[in-house]
Each structure stands twice: as structure tokens, then as C-alpha cells.
Regions:
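Aromatic-lined glycan-binding groove of carbohydrate-active enzymes
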Residues: 197-266
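Cleavable N-terminal signal peptides of Sec/SRP-targeted secreted and luminal proteins
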Residues: 2-16
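Processing junctions and N-termini across compartments
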Residues: 9, 18, 23, 28-30, ...
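Active-site beta->alpha N-cap acidic-glycine motif
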Residues: 17-112, 117-122, 130-136, 141-146, ...
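C-terminal regions of proteins
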Residues: 311-357
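Short acidic, glycine/proline-rich loop/turn micro-motifs
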Residues: 122-126, 235-237
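Short low-complexity, flexible loop/linker segments enriched in glycine and/or proline
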Residues: 126-129, 195-202, 323-325
């Protein structure tokens, strides 16, 4: 009881330390470290001069089944400037194959965090305190770096499970853990024109669809808004596989046009980043949707002013906005690959549920299955 009381007092004290965010002052909130929440294009560029970024993301565990889809639809793609096309994986820990995560990283894709446990109920994420979020995400960063041999500084992003916002604590955890951006926060009010990425130094105009949303001034982390699509009935949907009124799932042409219509709202508007956010299973069970996505990516890869990129590359451009005429002449992103010595581990007893797990890792095996409070399984 005394421990619970002390933890409660810590949480209250922690919350009290964060100052309430004030209305954004554009004369003080300056790039590259600060940006007001706004639909204004960074750098004051005209829409025609803005590179249209396309962010393709996949959520959840990486395994021997879904890697086949990723290899099929993503590998070997290049943008029109000759640079490899990017994508971002928000990876949850349970049942993830870290040898395959290493493969994705070495292919140039971005690996970000989707929590250690991805557990239900959804209220767990709304109510999680700072300490829980450190175990779910900061510790997952250590786990990912260790078992997939990804440099710690290359793991930059977060997507909260179920897109359930958490108020201030998740962003404070990010600020303290060297994490750069969150890509969990949907908007249905700032779609056309779209809301550009911004920081939380000042109060946000972002609509709060899945409360609680942050209210404090938290310098450091960026928000990449999840700009909603419109389904065929005009209803908003944050992820492609959450749209309710969709074309028939076996109609490739209709799905291609559905994707293209949502893309063109950005492309012919203020060119805020366009997100194709999805879970792999939806493509696996709907081959026509997968074919439509491939067709759409082919289209984007042939546009001279649109680019499939990793999420962090969007932040880098917003911090230093340059016209597309200059962007296409920039050198391609460089990174150091990390050779993986694949090791199969198991059975590993899990201390949280008593089950046995197998793991595929890029170094020595853990003693037990990694979990909350023991991310390296020691």
C-alpha cells in the first residue's frame, strides 16, 4: 500500500512539473527545433514547389509470414530521383523475428516502436503512467537495438497501440529517451489543407480524436499527424484497413482509384505528407488491395515531385524545407548496414505468462523471454 501511495505521489508530482502549453508564438518558435501546429507549408513555399511525401507504414510484429509481403511490394523500389523508396515499420515485440527486422533495416527501411506488449484493454494505454511507458517504449528501443543490431540513434519513432493517445506522459518519455517523433495522432479537422508535422513547445490546434491528448509544453518530440482518409461515404478513417465504406475488396481498379483520390487531396492541396497506414494482414487476405497498393506505389515512384520516404525523412525536410527542384538533387540517404549472425533461441520461458517462446536474434540468446522490466531477458 505504501509503495502504491509513493508511486501515485510521483505521478502527481511529475504531472505538476510540466508547464501548460501556451498559444504558439511564430516569432519564437523557429525551425529547426520548433514549429507551430499549422496547415501552413514549412518555409513559406508554394505548393507546386513542395515535394509530396508519401509515408507507407506497417504495424505490429515482423515474422516469416508477413516478410514475404514486404519483400514483394517494397524491395527494389526507387523514387524518380534515383534514391531508394522508403517505408516505416512500427514493430511490436511479441512474436517478432529480429533477424528479419535487421533485414528490413539493412534494406534502408525505418524501424520504429509499437510497444513491448501491445496489450489490451485499450484503456491500459490511455492510463499508462510515465514509468510504464518507459518500460513499453524506451526499453523496447534497447531491446530492438540489441537483438536486431540496429544502432540506438537510428530508432526514432513511436506509434501507440490502437492509436490511443496518452496525454503528456508519452511525449515526456520520448523527450527523455531520445525519440524524435510520434505518428499516432489522427486528425479529421485538418485534412484539406492538411496539418503539417510540428512540435509541442506550444499549444496544438490538433483535434483530439482519441483522448487524452497532450496539454503541456514539451520541447523536443515532433508530431507527424495521421491525416485521415475519406471513405466512399465521406467518413474519416485513420488507417486504410479501418475504412468502413470501401470499394469491393476484390476490385483492384476501384481500390486504386480510392487510394488515388485520397492522395490527390494532398497532392493538389498544400502537399502535407500523405500516409498509407496499414496492417500487412489486410493485404494478405485481399490480393486486389495489395495489387492496388503496388500500382499506386508505381505511380508515385514515377512522379517527379512525389517521394516515398521513411517517416524521419519527413521531419528532416520540415526542419530544413527546400524546394523540390533542390530536393531532387540532394544525395540519397546514407546509413551503415549491420551484418546479422542469425541465432535461433528457445524454448525461452516467459516470466509474465509462463509460456515458452522461440526467438530469432542477431547475437547471443537471452536467458528468458524479454518482457516489461527485463528487455534483454537477463
Amino acid at each position: 500500500m505504501r509503495l502504491i501511495l509513493l508511486l501515485s505521489l510521483f505521478v502527481v508530482a511529475f504531472a505538476a512539473e510540466l508547464p501548460l502549453a501556451e498559444e504558439c508564438d511564430e516569432t519564437k518558435c523557429l525551425l529547426p527545433r520548433c514549429r507551430c501546429s499549422s496547415t501552413n507549408i514549412p518555409g513559406g513555399l508554394a505548393p507546386r514547389d513542395v515535394p509530396q511525401f508519401v509515408s507507407v507504414t506497417f504495424d505490429d510484429a515482423v515474422n516469416v509470414i508477413n516478410i514475404e509481403t514486404y519483400r514483394e511490394v517494397l524491395y527494389g523500389r526507387s523514387n524518380s530521383n534515383g534514391c531508394p523508396a522508403g517505408a516505416t515499420f512500427y514493430v511490436s515485440h511479441e512474436y517478432t523475428n529480429y533477424v528479419l527486422v535487421n533485414e528490413l533495416y539493412n534494406r534502408g527501411y525505418e524501424v520504429s516502436l509499437h510497444s513491448m506488449t501491445h496489450q489490451t484493454p485499450q484503456t491500459y494505454w490511455a492510463e499508462a503512467d510515465y514509468d510504464v511507458l518507459v518500460k513499453e517504449f524506451a526499453d523496447q528501443k534497447s531491446l530492438m537495438s540489441h537483438f536486431a543490431l540496429i544502432p540506438d540513434q537510428e530508432i526514432r519513432g513511436v506509434r501507440l497501440p490502437f492509436l490511443q493517445m496518452n496525454g503528456n506522459a508519452s511525449f515526456q518519455m520520448m523527450a527523455d529517451s531520445g525519440l524524435v517523433y510520434d505518428n499516432s495522432w489522427p486528425t479529421v479537422s485538418h485534412v484539406n489543407p492538411g496539418l503539417w508535422p510540428y512540435t509541442l513547445d506550444y499549444a496544438s490546434i490538433h483535434d483530439c480524436i482519441v483522448p487524452p491528448c497532450p496539454s503541456a509544453s514539451i520541447p523536443g518530440p515532433w508530431v507527424i499527424p495521421m491525416i485521415s482518409w475519406s471513405d466512399l461515404n465521406g467518413s474519416p478513417c485513420s488507417m486504410a484497413d479501418s475504412c468502413y465504406f470501401t470499394p469491393p475488396l476484390d476490385d483492384e481498379n476501384a481500390w486504386y482509384n480510392f487510394i488515388l483520390t485520397n492522395f490527390e487531396r494532398h497532392y493538389h492541396g498544400n502537399r502535407a505528407p500523405f500516409g498509407f497506414y496499414i496492417h500487412e494482414w489486410y493485404l494478405a487476405v485481399n490480393p486486389a488491395v495489395k495489387a492496388a497498393l503496388v500500382r499506386f506505389m508505381n505511380y508515385v515512384n514515377n512522379l517527379n515531385d512525389a517521394f516515398m520516404v521513411n517517416a524521419n525523412q519527413i521531419i528532416e525536410w520540415v526542419q530544413n524545407p527546400i524546394p523540390v527542384s533542390e530536393y531532387i538533387r540532394r544525395p540519397c540517404r546514407r546509413f551503415s548496414s549491420t551484418p546479422c549472425r542469425a541465432t535461433s533461441c528457445g524454448p525461452l520461458r516467459s516470466e509474465h505468462n509462463g509460456l515458452d517462446y522461440w526467438m530469432q536474434v542477431c547475437n547471443t540468446c537471452p536467458r528468458v523471454y524479454p518482457w516489461l522490466g527485463n528487455p534483454l531477458g537477463r
